[in-house]
Regions:
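Rhodanese-like catalytic fold shared by cysteine-dependent sulfurtransferases
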Residues: 8-197
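Hard-cation-handling environments
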Residues: 1
């Protein structure tokens, strides 16, 4: 697997096709453990320049010690050599608000507890940690939109779905935090401590 650990904005602007994003400056270890199930999985890294060794060490600390190497010179060297690269399309929360009037498909990849506390009305819960169980729910042809709380997990979801051939995915940047500032209808907030587990 090609694992890209740069910032989600950098990954969105350009990445090696079929690479998976899990940013080193987010909840890196938990998401690696959750999404790369085989700890013996060979890994090729794309890192921010100068953070190659840190990335290898942090993977090894959680048991992933089969890192084959990293892209020398980072993603820019790949791009500068004229090699093919992919991007993640995105919209702002304000644009999503306009699109919601057209009943576009939107998916919430936050944890079930976050979704239960508050979510966009009519939008299904497809949590990132079980995204493989929801693959069939995503449209094959029609453009669809994903969001999380702030924009990190939705890019992970986009990378997984793009690697599986879903190039019609669009990320809502800023996530639910930005969506809350629009007129998009959300459910009434329920304090997570009052939710039954």
């Amino acid at each position: 697997v090609i694992l890209d650990v740069r910032h989600q904005d950098d990954f969105s602007k350009g990445h090696i096709p079929q690479s998976i994003f899990i940013g080193i400056d987010g909840d890196f270890a938990p998401w690696v453990g959750s999404l790369i199930l085989d700890i013996k999985q060979p890994i090729l890294l794309v890192t921010p320049v100068g953070r190659e060794e840190e990335s290898i060490t942090r993977l090894a600390r959680v048991g992933y010690d089969n890192t084959l190497g990293y892209l020398k010179g980072g993603f820019e060297s790949w791009k500068n050599e004229g090699k093919e690269y992919d991007t993640v399309n995105w919209v702002t929360a304000d644009t999503l608000e306009e699109l919601m009037a057209e009943k576009v498909p939107v998916f919430d990849v936050r944890k079930e507890g976050e979704y239960a506390a508050e979510h966009i009305e009519g939008v299904p819960s497809t949590p990132l940690n079980s995204i493989n169980d929801h693959i069939e729910e995503f449209p094959k042809e029609e453009e669809f939109y994903v969001h999380c709380a702030g924009g990190y997990r939705s890019v992970i979801a986009a990378s997984i779905l793009k690697a599986r051939g879903y190039h019609n995915i669009i990320n809502a940047i800023g996530g639910f935090t930005s969506i809350k500032k629009t007129a998009i209808k959300t459910t009434n907030y329920v304090c997570p401590s009052t939710l039954k587990s």
